[in-house]
Amino acid sequence: MKRFLHCVSVLLLFELAFSSTDTLHYDVTVFGIRCGKIFYSSEKENISITALSSGLIEYFYPFKNDYHTSFDTLTFGIRSYKKTVKQGDFKQRLSGKWDSSTEEFTYDNFDSFKRADSCMTIFTLLERLNRENPEKLDTKWFPIEHEGSLYRSRVLLAGTEKILINGDSIVSNHLRLDLIPDDREIKMLDRSDYFSQNITHSESIKQIWVERKPSGKILKASVKIGPITITATITNK
């Protein structure tokens, strides 16, 4: 059950990070049973995300997580971050800002971390994929700031596929995301929400199907941890 909850939480936010400027809705399912829903909206330099439990999971593990990120529209480097998490009995708030004068990202009530101007987060990286042609980013490495830890990230273009969405066959780019930790980093938090804690899990296999340009929004995604695969599918294409 714990591994199942990890997968659900990871995919909920992972799927959110791909979308257009409209508010998009996604259903998340495991074994064909809906367990969560996602609301995502982005403006020019801001991303707002809400993930909610639904279906059977609402009865034994309700959650409502809000994430807000601002970023540089040229480099997609993080400028500010705020999250408010409620997962069962666990609650957490975290916020921080990037200081251009010191090139540090400082978390309120926590430490400061030296980060380059172009250092992204998982959310801004995925938003970048939403706005740019994945072929231009294929196999390239980028630094990722993640709650005080530094990672190297890359997307791998696995090919072009047709997937079925609401009865329509749509051509999409099939991507895989890799995240590799910098071993010199020490974890800032003893505990975090399931998404933040497990998106970097060494065993998680993250795959995304993004509609080919011009719209570029994500159509479907899957996250696999161990034997469990969770799938998210857009509902308001």
Model-derived features: positions:
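Small/flexible residues
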Residues: F4-L5, D117, R154-L156
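Acidic, serine/threonine-rich low-complexity disordered tracts
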Residues: S20-W98, P143-K237
